[in-house]
Protein backbone atom coordinates (compact mmCIF):
# COMPACT_ATOMS: atom_id res chain seq x y z
CA UNK A 1 0.00 0.00 0.00
CA UNK A 2 1.34 3.42 -0.97
CA UNK A 3 1.77 6.08 1.70
CA UNK A 4 0.11 9.40 0.82
CA UNK A 5 3.04 11.88 0.62
CA UNK A 6 0.72 14.79 1.44
CA UNK A 7 -0.53 13.13 4.64
CA UNK A 8 2.66 13.99 6.48
CA UNK A 9 1.91 17.73 6.12
CA UNK A 10 -1.62 17.61 7.52
CA UNK A 11 -0.74 18.50 11.12
CA UNK A 12 2.45 20.44 10.45
CA UNK A 13 2.31 24.23 10.71
CA UNK A 14 2.21 25.78 7.26
CA UNK A 15 4.52 28.72 6.74
CA UNK A 16 3.46 31.79 4.76
CA UNK A 17 5.76 31.11 1.78
CA UNK A 18 4.55 27.52 1.39
CA UNK A 19 0.92 28.60 1.68
CA UNK A 20 1.40 31.25 -1.03
CA UNK A 21 3.15 28.68 -3.22
CA UNK A 22 0.29 26.19 -2.88
CA UNK A 23 -2.56 28.66 -3.50
CA UNK A 24 -0.56 30.11 -6.40
CA UNK A 25 -1.30 26.89 -8.24
CA UNK A 26 -4.95 27.93 -8.46
CA UNK A 27 -5.49 29.89 -11.67
CA UNK A 28 -7.95 32.75 -11.44
CA UNK A 29 -9.38 35.61 -13.41
CA UNK A 30 -8.19 39.16 -12.86
CA UNK A 31 -10.43 42.01 -11.80
CA UNK A 32 -10.13 45.62 -10.80
CA UNK A 33 -12.54 46.39 -8.00
CA UNK A 34 -13.55 50.05 -7.98
CA UNK A 35 -15.51 52.21 -5.57
CA UNK A 36 -15.93 55.87 -4.72
CA UNK A 37 -16.33 57.73 -1.46
CA UNK A 38 -16.89 61.48 -1.17
CA UNK A 39 -16.32 61.80 -4.91
CA UNK A 40 -12.87 60.18 -4.80
CA UNK A 41 -12.40 57.06 -6.98
CA UNK A 42 -10.54 54.04 -5.63
CA UNK A 43 -9.47 50.84 -7.34
CA UNK A 44 -7.36 47.76 -6.77
CA UNK A 45 -6.41 44.67 -8.76
CA UNK A 46 -8.06 41.71 -7.05
CA UNK A 47 -8.11 38.01 -7.95
CA UNK A 48 -9.99 36.86 -4.82
CA UNK A 49 -13.43 37.24 -6.39
CA UNK A 50 -16.03 34.52 -6.85
CA UNK A 51 -19.70 34.07 -7.59
CA UNK A 52 -21.71 32.93 -4.58
CA UNK A 53 -25.16 32.17 -5.99
CA UNK A 54 -27.54 33.23 -8.74
CA UNK A 55 -30.75 33.55 -6.70
CA UNK A 56 -30.29 36.33 -5.83
CA UNK A 57 -27.14 37.02 -7.83
CA UNK A 58 -24.36 37.39 -5.26
CA UNK A 59 -20.56 37.50 -5.15
CA UNK A 60 -17.73 37.36 -2.62
CA UNK A 61 -14.81 39.79 -2.83
CA UNK A 62 -11.79 39.67 -0.51
CA UNK A 63 -9.71 42.83 -0.02
CA UNK A 64 -6.68 43.63 2.09
CA UNK A 65 -7.82 45.92 4.89
CA UNK A 66 -4.84 48.25 4.29
CA UNK A 67 -6.13 49.26 0.84
CA UNK A 68 -7.90 52.56 0.28
CA UNK A 69 -10.39 50.63 -1.87
CA UNK A 70 -11.29 48.56 1.18
CA UNK A 71 -12.05 51.70 3.22
CA UNK A 72 -14.09 53.20 0.36
CA UNK A 73 -16.23 50.05 0.04
CA UNK A 74 -16.85 49.91 3.79
CA UNK A 75 -18.13 53.49 3.67
CA UNK A 76 -19.94 53.52 0.32
CA UNK A 77 -21.36 49.95 0.60
CA UNK A 78 -21.23 49.65 -3.21
CA UNK A 79 -18.47 48.62 -5.62
CA UNK A 80 -17.92 47.42 -9.18
CA UNK A 81 -16.01 44.33 -10.22
CA UNK A 82 -14.35 45.09 -13.58
CA UNK A 83 -13.34 41.81 -15.23
CA UNK A 84 -10.24 42.33 -17.35
CA UNK A 85 -9.61 41.07 -20.86
CA UNK A 86 -6.46 39.24 -21.93
CA UNK A 87 -4.89 42.42 -23.33
CA UNK A 88 -5.20 44.38 -20.06
CA UNK A 89 -2.23 43.10 -18.03
CA UNK A 90 -0.66 46.58 -17.91
CA UNK A 91 -3.90 47.99 -16.47
CA UNK A 92 -3.94 45.22 -13.85
CA UNK A 93 -0.33 46.06 -12.98
CA UNK A 94 -1.15 49.78 -12.61
CA UNK A 95 -4.02 49.10 -10.21
CA UNK A 96 -1.83 46.67 -8.24
CA UNK A 97 0.92 49.28 -7.77
CA UNK A 98 0.76 51.25 -4.50
CA UNK A 99 0.86 55.01 -4.99
CA UNK A 100 0.18 54.89 -8.73
CA UNK A 101 -2.19 57.43 -10.28
CA UNK A 102 -4.50 54.57 -11.10
CA UNK A 103 -7.20 56.42 -13.00
CA UNK A 104 -4.86 58.55 -15.18
CA UNK A 105 -5.39 57.79 -18.87
CA UNK A 106 -8.13 55.25 -18.08
CA UNK A 107 -11.58 55.67 -19.61
CA UNK A 108 -14.05 55.60 -16.72
CA UNK A 109 -17.84 55.82 -16.51
CA UNK A 110 -18.72 57.63 -13.29
CA UNK A 111 -21.92 55.93 -12.19
CA UNK A 112 -24.32 56.26 -9.27
CA UNK A 113 -22.47 53.53 -7.33
CA UNK A 114 -18.92 54.53 -8.26
CA UNK A 115 -16.55 54.27 -11.20
CA UNK A 116 -16.69 51.57 -13.87
CA UNK A 117 -13.80 50.98 -16.25
CA UNK A 118 -15.07 51.59 -19.79
CA UNK A 119 -12.76 49.04 -21.41
CA UNK A 120 -13.42 46.14 -19.01
CA UNK A 121 -14.36 42.82 -20.59
CA UNK A 122 -17.33 42.60 -18.22
CA UNK A 123 -18.52 44.23 -15.04
CA UNK A 124 -20.74 43.60 -12.02
CA UNK A 125 -21.95 46.48 -9.88
CA UNK A 126 -22.65 45.31 -6.35
CA UNK A 127 -24.31 46.34 -3.09
CA UNK A 128 -22.67 45.08 0.10
CA UNK A 129 -25.05 42.98 2.21
CA UNK A 130 -22.50 41.69 4.72
CA UNK A 131 -18.81 41.73 5.49
CA UNK A 132 -16.53 39.89 7.85
CA UNK A 133 -12.89 39.92 8.80
CA UNK A 134 -10.63 37.19 7.51
CA UNK A 135 -7.13 37.75 8.86
CA UNK A 136 -5.52 40.66 6.99
CA UNK A 137 -8.48 40.83 4.62
CA UNK A 138 -12.18 41.62 4.71
CA UNK A 139 -14.67 39.42 2.89
CA UNK A 140 -17.49 41.38 1.29
CA UNK A 141 -20.70 39.53 0.50
CA UNK A 142 -22.59 41.52 -2.10
CA UNK A 143 -25.69 41.40 -4.25
CA UNK A 144 -25.17 42.16 -7.93
CA UNK A 145 -27.43 45.06 -8.96
CA UNK A 146 -26.15 45.49 -12.52
CA UNK A 147 -24.00 43.40 -14.85
CA UNK A 148 -22.89 43.30 -18.45
CA UNK A 149 -20.46 41.19 -20.46
CA UNK A 150 -18.64 42.05 -23.65
CA UNK A 151 -16.81 39.73 -26.00
CA UNK A 152 -13.27 38.47 -25.78
CA UNK A 153 -11.14 36.33 -23.51
CA UNK A 154 -10.30 37.02 -19.86
CA UNK A 155 -6.94 37.89 -18.36
CA UNK A 156 -5.73 35.06 -16.13
CA UNK A 157 -3.40 34.93 -13.12
CA UNK A 158 -1.33 31.87 -12.25
CA UNK A 159 1.71 31.50 -9.97
CA UNK A 160 2.35 35.23 -9.82
CA UNK A 161 2.05 35.89 -13.54
CA UNK A 162 -0.59 37.19 -15.90
CA UNK A 163 -1.57 35.13 -18.92
CA UNK A 164 -4.46 34.25 -21.15
CA UNK A 165 -7.04 31.50 -21.10
CA UNK A 166 -6.96 28.82 -23.78
CA UNK A 167 -10.16 26.76 -23.88
CA UNK A 168 -9.72 23.02 -24.04
CA UNK A 169 -11.58 21.56 -26.98
CA UNK A 170 -12.97 18.07 -26.50
CA UNK A 171 -16.05 16.97 -28.41
CA UNK A 172 -16.98 14.65 -25.56
CA UNK A 173 -17.35 17.52 -23.08
CA UNK A 174 -20.52 19.52 -22.85
CA UNK A 175 -19.87 23.14 -23.68
CA UNK A 176 -22.92 25.06 -22.51
CA UNK A 177 -24.05 25.92 -19.03
CA UNK A 178 -27.50 24.53 -19.84
CA UNK A 179 -25.94 21.17 -20.73
CA UNK A 180 -24.13 21.11 -17.38
CA UNK A 181 -27.17 22.02 -15.29
CA UNK A 182 -28.22 19.60 -12.58
CA UNK A 183 -31.41 17.79 -13.48
CA UNK A 184 -34.21 17.83 -10.87
CA UNK A 185 -34.88 14.13 -11.61
From Swiss-Prot:
SUPFAM superfamilies: FMN-binding split barrel. It is an enzyme of class 1 (oxidoreductase). Inhibited by methimazole. It catalyses: 4-nitrophenol + NADH + O2 + H(+) = 4-nitrocatechol + NAD(+) + H2O; 4-nitrocatechol + NADPH + O2 = 2-hydroxy-1,4-benzoquinone + nitrite + NADP(+) + H2O; 4-nitrocatechol + NADH + O2 = 2-hydroxy-1,4-benzoquinone + nitrite + NAD(+) + H2O. InterPro entries: Flavin_Rdtase-like_dom (IPR002563), NADH-dep_flavin_reductase (IPR050268), Split_barrel_FMN-bd (IPR012349). Its EC number is 1.14.13.166, 1.14.13.29. Pathway: Aromatic compound metabolism; Xenobiotic degradation. Induction: By 4-NP. Keywords: Aromatic hydrocarbons catabolism, Monooxygenase, NAD, Oxidoreductase. GO terms for molecular function: 4-nitrocatechol 4-monooxygenase activity; 4-nitrophenol 2-monooxygenase activity; FMN binding; riboflavin reductase (NADPH) activity. One of its GO terms (biological process) is catabolic process. Belongs to the non-flavoprotein flavin reductase family. Involved in the degradation of para-nitrophenol (4-NP). Catalyzes both the initial hydroxylation of 4-NP to produce 4-nitrocatechol (4-NCA) and the subsequent oxidative release of the nitro group from 4-NCA to produce 2-hydroxy-1,4-benzoquinone. It can also use 4-nitroresorcinol as substrate with a rate of nitrite release similar to that observed with the two physiological substrates, 4-PN and 4-NCA. The 4-NP/4-NCA monooxygenase is composed of an oxygenase component NpcA and a reductase component NpcB. This is 4-nitrophenol 4-monooxygenase/4-nitrocatechol 2-monooxygenase, reductase component. It comes from Rhodococcus opacus. The lineage of its organism: Bacteria, Bacillati, Actinomycetota, Actinomycetes, Mycobacteriales. The gene is npcB.
